[in-house]
């Protein structure tokens, strides 16, 4: 009879499952971008039509034609208010499926002050340069910008227009172009090709402008893309984008006052 105390056998613990930190590659990112843009256009269209219907129900004497929707500031402001949450929700879902924290994936971190200063200086240089070139070539600011401001003011929706154009619109676009697309493209395509591609795509969606001003948007996109790569901060590019749009609102107000 064995009197030695029995020693219980301890089974080794199974290793905890490791979550795969998936990152969407360039083509998967581009594939996601298509339905996201569809959502943007769809919700902007639905928002514009819904606002037109509601407005004409409340003000039957004020007719908003289909042709004027693209330059009606109240309609545009409401359409951005409707579309931005939908677009941001879809992008949030895409990032969640990547299993990478949202802040890391989209570079949602505060920038350094020196990057802020450099960004302001570069944007000022681009805007001054394109402004001088516009004067030399006889380019005039599109008239629909003043129409957009006036129609929003007459509808009593100027605060909503400012919020949509200075906050919601820039944040939506930065999350899309310098956030989702930049993160998906840069590791495979390289930083500079990604800067150029995202700037070009960003300019293309502004089809309401003439070619000259689309070129200006492309140049701004190059600066914002470079700053995104240098600083690693999407909040920096959002703030600068909002600053540019604020200046555009001031310009629209000056045009409308003439």
Task: Enumerate the language-model features and the residues they cover.
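N-terminal, membrane-interfacial amphipathic/helix-forming hydrophobic leader that caps
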Residues: 1-105, 113, 249-258
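Structural signal for membrane-spanning alpha-helices in multi-pass inner-membrane proteins
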Residues: 90-95, 130, 134, 165, ...
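Short juxtamembrane and helix-loop transition motifs at transmembrane-helix boundaries
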Residues: 83, 156-157, 172-181, 198-206
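Juxtamembrane helix-loop-helix connectors linking adjacent transmembrane helices
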Residues: 53-77, 99-169, 187, 253-258
